[in-house]
Structure formats: C-alpha cells, structure tokens
C-alpha cells in the first residue's frame, strides 16, 4: 500500500488576495453578533446569486418584476424561508433563530458560485461559519460541500475534523466528534430515533465519535452509538451498537470483523461488557 499524503495546491496570487479579503470581511461581520446575521446572509447571497440587484427591497416590491424572480430574490433572505427543523417539536426556537441565517448562508453558498465542488475558498467559508453555529468547534475544521445539519447548535467538534461531501449530521440530540475524526461521503450520523409504534414518539440521545474515528463511505451511525477511539465503521455499514476502540465494524448491523494492526494489546479483549447508559 502506498502512503499518499494530500498535496498542497496553489491558486493564482490575485485570486488568493480576493479570498483573503472576503474571509476577513466575513469574519468581521460575523463578529458583529447574531442581531446582524440575517442581513449578513442576505447581503452576501444577493451579491453571489443576484449581483445585478442594487436595491433589494425595491426589486422585491416591484410589480414589474416577474413573480418567480421576486420569489427567488425573497429566498435569499433567511427570514423568508423555513427549514425542516423549525417544524420539529423538540427545537429550541430561540437557539435555532440565532444560527438559522448562518445555516442558510452555508447551504445556499454551496449551491452557487463560488461554492459547490470548489475547495480553496468554500472550506474557509464553512470554517468561518462553524464556530458561530456549533456548540463547540475546534481548530482546522474541514468541511466539503452539501453537508447538512438538523439544528447545528448541538454539534460539538474537536480539532482537525474532516467531513466530506453530502453528509447528514442529525444533531437533534447531540453529536460529539473527537479530534481527527473523519466522516466520508454520503455518511449519516443520527442522534434521534422514532418509536416503531408511534412515529411522533421521539428519543434524542448523544452520539459520540471519539478521537481518530473513521466513518467510511455511505455508512450510518444510529442514535446513541459511541464509536471508540480509533474505531472504524466500514462502507455502507449501519452501526446500531457501540464500536469498541480500534475495532473495524462492517455490515448491517455492523459487527467487529477485525482489530486494527496498530492497536494496543487491550484492544483485543473480547469479553462482553455492559452497555453504558445514555449520557445526559
């Protein structure tokens, strides 16, 4: 097996200067506080998606502008849209109202230029937004496009975490990601579950991925599961129970098939242990 660290990719200096200037401006505006974030999101989305619009309110109110165009402009302001989590009975409406403008900016930025599959700038934009959305966000957070959250405010993220494209992080309960966690494309991490009898009966519990955990392509981790340090959930697996440290669990439901070869001796202990109670 060949060791292949990531390459450093340079962009033209002129583009890099614009990137730096805009990230600096974004961070300054974020620092002004939540009371300004609806306007912040609207201003940037208008600049990105409708750069010809110089007077937003006038254009939205103008009966000469086609209705569909006015609807598109309205949707650039987070106050004019609703997101699915706003309909959940367990939402903290005040906390969500605080982060909603930044979530809407994040999601919509991903669907227009210069977002999407571009890496150089969008990773920095998401890194700037995340500390203002999450309960905690460590250093060097790296997130690719089309990642979605439930509430956002129940995310606890360590250092050097990488989340790849099209991941769902359902933080209706709490999701804790330790240092150096890697979540691959199309994975789903849940922290709530529904009764099989009554769909409206919902249980939310913390889901924990400890340090150096890897959740691989299209895998799912269900609510309340703890993946231990250096544990791994294989491609397309569904983790319904805890994954022991250093173990590789695969299949549906996911079961341990091996221990990583660099694991310490105690990782090979196989006796059954009692499942820990859910964290408060």
Region spans (language model):
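Terminal amphipathic alpha-helical/low-complexity segments used for targeting or macromolecular assembly
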Residues: 1-132, 257, 262-280
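Flexible, glycine/small-residue-enriched loop-and-beta-strand segment within the central core
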Residues: 112, 116-127, 133, 145-227, ...
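Short proline/glycine- and basic residue-enriched helix-capping loop/turn segments at helix->loop/beta transitions
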Residues: 136
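Short-chain dehydrogenase/reductase
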Residues: 182, 214, 232, 238, ...
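Short beta-to-alpha loop/turn elements within the nucleotide-binding domains of ABC transporters
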Residues: 225, 236-237, 243, 252
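Conserved catalytic segment of ABC-fold P-loop ATPases
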Residues: 228-229, 244-246
């Amino acid at each position: 097996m060949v060791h292949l660290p990531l390459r450093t990719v340079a962009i033209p200096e002129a583009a890099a200067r614009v990137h730096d200037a805009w990230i600096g401006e974004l961070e300054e505006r974020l620092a002004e506080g939540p009371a300004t974030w609806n306007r912040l999101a609207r201003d940037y989305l208008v600049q990105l998606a409708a750069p010809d619009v110089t007077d937003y309110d006038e254009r939205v109110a103008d009966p000469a502008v086609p209705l569909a165009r006015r609807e598109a402009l309205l949707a650039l302001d987070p106050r004019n849209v609703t997101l699915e989590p706003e309909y959940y009975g367990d939402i903290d409406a005040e906390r969500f109202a605080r982060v909603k403008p930044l979530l809407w900016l994040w999601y919509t930025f991903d669907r227009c230029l210069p977002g999407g599959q571009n890496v150089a700038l969008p990773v920095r934009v998401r890194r700037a937004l995340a500390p203002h959305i999450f309960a905690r966000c460590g250093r060097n957070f790296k997130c690719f496009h089309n990642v979605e959250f439930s509430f956002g405010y129940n995310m606890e993220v360590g250092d050097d975490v990488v989340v790849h494209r099209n991941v769902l992080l359902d933080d209706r309960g709490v999701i804790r990601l330790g240092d150096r966690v890697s979540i691959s494309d199309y994975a789903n991490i849940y922290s709530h579950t529904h009764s099989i009898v009554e769909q409206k009966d919902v249980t939310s519990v913390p889901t924990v991925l400890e340090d150096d955990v890897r959740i691989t392509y299209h895998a799912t981790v269900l609510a309340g599961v703890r993946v231990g340090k250096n544990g791994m959930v294989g491609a397309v697996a569904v983790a319904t129970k805890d994954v022991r440290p250093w173990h590789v669990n695969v299949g549906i439901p996911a079961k341990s098939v091996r221990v990583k070869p660099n694991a310490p001796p105690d990782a090979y202990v196989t006796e059954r242990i009692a499942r820990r109670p859910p964290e408060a």
